[in-house]
């Protein structure tokens, strides 16, 4: 005979019983307890999986809105007119395009972001390509422009040894003037051709006036006097050359007064020939005889 031996755990469990053949069998009264245990374990498993299902639902992206060509044309036209439409405008656009106001608001938000990004890229390209080459061609390095200056020893140097004295300036070199010299830039001309021409023409003009030779000679002497020459030269000289007095136009006014007085004297010294009456060959008696009574 074969005997089936039970283990210690099977012998201790109340749910097991020996059949006639000696094989262990489950007690039918304990099936409800086993079913409840399985249900509880299944519920616990579902409860643990519920948070994961919620997180998966949250991670799911919403369905993208597909716009038609007519809707995009209407939205683009409105965006060109107004980039920040208010609530009423968005509602009107939603009615025209058969969309919701929320979809229209989101579209305008994304369109503004795209527009700002494109503007920034265009400005960066202009600064990099357009203006960069022009500024590099126009601007010179500081070393080339200020090679003669020594900024480190600026405070220790005196005015005599200033770098300006050694620096060459095209404007001053063309005029043969040092930039730090104290001499005046403009000097009065030593000889003026126009005044010499005028003085040479005056005697011929005076000689053409009828009068005595002595008066003409006197007038010529007056014209050649040093007062006239000095007045004429001072009148024609540049006003910047008068450095003697503080007033610039004093000599010009005095010369004009002197010239007027000289002209008046010349006019008074001119001698006009006296007009002589025609000599008559008739005597007073003849006048009396010829008159009718």
Curated annotation (Swiss-Prot):
UniProt motif (Nuclear localization signal) ranges: 260-264
Keywords of the record: Activator, Developmental protein, DNA-binding, Homeobox, Nucleus, Transcription, Transcription regulation
Main location: nucleus
Keyword Ligase: no
Bilayer-spanning residue ranges: none
GO molecular function: DNA-binding transcription factor activity, RNA polymerase II-specific; RNA polymerase II cis-regulatory region sequence-specific DNA binding
Protein's name in the database: Pituitary homeobox 3
Gene: pitx3
